[in-house]
Each structure stands twice: as C-alpha cells, then as structure tokens.
C-alpha cells in the first residue's frame, strides 16, 4: 500500500510502508530492540539520543506484511525507552532496528477521508486503494483542548426520532451523550439506529470510532452506511462519514489510540471546514480497558478494581477535546459497556462527569421484551428543563416519570399481595404505567432484517402529544398490547381495533 504524504522540516526521505511517517536522512536516529513483552517493547538508542515521549518509532523490517509502529511511553534511562506497539509484535526479535520519526502518530485529515475506513495509523483498510487526492493533510493525533474563550454552549435539541430518548433524556446539539448498558442489552443496535436516524438527516459529517468492538459489527455498520447513502462508493467526496477502526482482535496500543485518531479527523471538519460534526464511539469502556492492559505491562501500580492510576487523566484528555467552538460543533454519542451491570464501576463512573445526557439500558426492561431497553428512571439529561424543551414537554415528561416511579414502588406490594389489595387510584396508575412502559418501545430500522417490522422515526411533536394523551387517561380503555411497538397514539388505536377483531 502506498504511503501517505506529510511535511517535515529539512531534507527528508520517505520510508516505504503503511505508516505515514517521514525521517530526516542526515540525523536518522536508530535504536535496537532489547526486550519484547507482548505489546510493550524496550528500545535502546545511542546515549543522550532518546526519542521524546509520544514520538512514533518505525521498524526497518517488515512484520506481517507491514512496518511496525511503536509509540514512546516511558524513558527508562538516558538511552532506553519503553514503547507501546500499535500492531502485533509477532516476529519481532532482539536487535531489530527502529527509527525515531521525530513526531507523534499522525493521520490524514480532510475531505479525501470521506467514505473511507482507516486503522489507528490512518492507513485505508477498505480495499479502495491509497488516498490519491491532494485535498488532505497530515495531523498529529494529540492536540490541545480548545480555549475556554473559543468554546460555545448551545441549547438546541437534537431530535433522534426515538420516543424514550426524545421525551425523557433529550440530546443537546454539540453535547456529549453516553449509552450505558451491560452485555447484550442493545447498545450497538441503539447507536446504529442513532447513526441511521441522525446521520442520514444530518447535512454535516459523521465520524465513527470503533474502539475494541466486534469486527462483524464494524463490517455491518459499513454496509449499512453504504445502503443508506451515507457512504457513496462511486463518488467518495459526496459521502458524509469517516470510519476509524481498532477492533477487539488488535493489540491494546491500537485500541487505546484509535479514538484519538478518529477525534483528530472530526476536529478538522469542526475547526477548518466550520462544520457541525457527529462523533460516534463504540465502545468507551474498551478505551479504558486497553489503557488498563498497557498500564499493567508498563509496570504501574493499579488503582481501584485493577484499573490504571491514570484513568481519570486519560479519559479527561480525550473527552475535553470533544466540544463545540465558535467555528463548529462536535456532538458525541458514546456507547459505554457497564461491567456486571454495575454503574459504580470506575470505568463507567469516570465517564459520567463528562456527559450532558445519559441513556441507561436495563436488563430488566430487555427481559420484558421492550426495546430499546432504555431505563426511563435511570436515564437523565441536562436538556430536560423548561427553558430548553418548553413547558408542555417538561410537564409531560415529569408526569410520565412520576407514574413509572409510583408503579416501581408498588411492585413489591403487587408481588406479595396482588393487584386486588391496591386502591382504585393505584390500580389506575399501574394500568397507565404498564401502557406507558410498552409505548416506550419502538421498532428500529436497523433491526428490521431480524424482526420483520419496519422501523419508524417519530417526530418530537408526535411523541409529546401521544404521551400527554396517555397520562391524561384519554386511552385508558385500550388494551396494553395495543401500545407495544407502535410509533404514535393513532397507530395504537388502529392496533387495538385489529386486536379486537382478532378476539384478543
């Protein structure tokens, strides 16, 4: 694969290989491998010539069909550096030579990246050839957080078309959203539906970072984007998305840095092209997990639950770059795996502080067959205030939550004594709560191939007015089943008539 191009000072020659790196021929700094410990490699350089922290080192030899790139993480002595491998170290041996590139890992940015799939080093991995156009440049994956004076706060709602989110935990344009959930409760399906609903209607650019997740899901997403027209294979520059993958089969170094590579591409569209960018990450937990693996190999003493002592700093360094400025915005949607469904685990807990909206997926709701399995009581948003959503939306959402909370508190009594022991008022609340619970379900476009039910995009006006009618008791006469997997209240009425005809 042809190498990408980039500018450096001095007379430079290009090293052949996948990584986009240049070295100054007259001052080439070569080190030798002295120790290999899976994803961590120690390199010895001439005394006093150790590379700077975060510099990229490139192998002279070819391993597994490409050159191996390392990133300097620690200075062990005045001649030895400890590095993180960004690809497999299979075949590496002592005394192999590595060249100091004199710069951090850099990736291509610009319109030439649209419609393409990249790895952590910015190499195209979609079998569509190298980047050949001139409308891209090279940028290091590390950059400063925008100045406070340049940052901008918006109070505009981003409509997702998903009822439970738009009503109870709305997303802000230019905000950060977390999708929390354990294994198998629907985080990736929800993020794919959000990409389908928002990216398709969104006129700006979407950047997706696949951090340590399944390769199959990455492949599915790529083809989903092609089918929906977000990626145009014939005319790449008409595409609206960039995909950057560091999947779970890759070493921890790649999984740790791939989010920064994708974020660098997103920042270009925000800062240079003044666009509103959607930045999707699946999964932030894998970012933390890879940092924990690297930390242990680097010999750091772990902190709580075995995580790296630098967890908060690493998370903050990335999250603070995801912000809106006077030039453009980055709206971020991040899937966050919750180990053992424990939200107090340090990995998801560290993410909470950075988010504007949290969408929590519940296994108990998934067990009821209600999808998306969003917990309406655990999910929250800073946008749910009268000033932002308006009085009608705010009052309806609070009444929905009150009914669901009352139902939750009555469940123990119902389990022990049964419904008969409840007052008439409580029986009415339970009946409405069960209807609301089912009405929060919704068929997804991306799940249509599995369910056979066409997906729906529900407008915010439909969502608010439908729930207003339910909490006011206008549809108390309809059966619970009529509210399941429908878009709005009119569909629920039609479904009730159909059920009545069928004798259900």
From Swiss-Prot:
Name the InterPro entries on file: AAA+_ATPase, ATP-synt_VA_C, ATP_synth_F1_bsu, ATPase_a/bsu_AS, ATPase_alpha/beta_chains, ATPase_F1/V1/A1_a/bsu_N, ATPase_F1/V1/A1_a/bsu_N_sf, ATPase_F1/V1/A1_a/bsu_nucl-bd
Record GO terms (molecular function)? ATP binding; ATP hydrolysis activity; proton-transporting ATP synthase activity, rotational mechanism
Q: How does it sit in the membrane?
A: Peripheral membrane protein
Q: Which residues bind ATP?
A: 181-188
Give the catalytic activity.
Answer: ATP + H2O + 4 H(+)(in) = ADP + phosphate + 5 H(+)(out)
Under the heading PROSITE patterns, the entry gives: ATPASE_ALPHA_BETA
Keywords associated with the record: ATP synthesis, ATP-binding, Cell inner membrane, Cell membrane, CF(1), Hydrogen ion transport, Ion transport, Membrane, Nucleotide-binding, Translocase, Transport
| Subunit description | F-type ATPases have 2 components, CF(1) - the catalytic core - and CF(0) - the membrane proton channel. CF(1) has five subunits: alpha(3), beta(3), gamma(1), delta(1), epsilon(1). CF(0) has three main subunits: a(1), b(2) and c(9-12). The alpha and beta chains form an alternating ring which encloses part of the gamma chain. CF(1) is attached to CF(0) by a central stalk formed by the gamma and epsilon chains, while a peripheral stalk is formed by the delta and b chains.
**Which family is this protein grouped under?**
Belongs to the ATPase alpha/beta chains family.
Q: Which HAMAP family does the record associate with it?
A: ATP_synth_beta_bact (MF_01347)
Q: What is the name of this protein? A: ATP synthase subunit beta
High-level lineage: Bacteria, Pseudomonadati, Pseudomonadota, Alphaproteobacteria, Rickettsiales
